[in-house]
Amino acid sequence: MEITFDGGKIISAHVDGHVIMTDQPVDNGGKGSAPAPFDLYLAAIGTC
């Protein structure tokens, strides 16, 4: 796994050929271009 900081508040996790992006909502200084990290965390727990 590799984690990259892609500018602004966008962070990507590169896992086994997949890219999982996160961003903050607009009202929290992000662009809202991807799920917020905590939302993605909850989705990961829910899909275990």
Residue ranges and their predicted role:
Residues 1-43:
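Extended beta-strand/beta-hairpin segments
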Residues 44-48:
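Short, thiol/selenol-centered motifs that function as redox-active sites or metal-ligating centers
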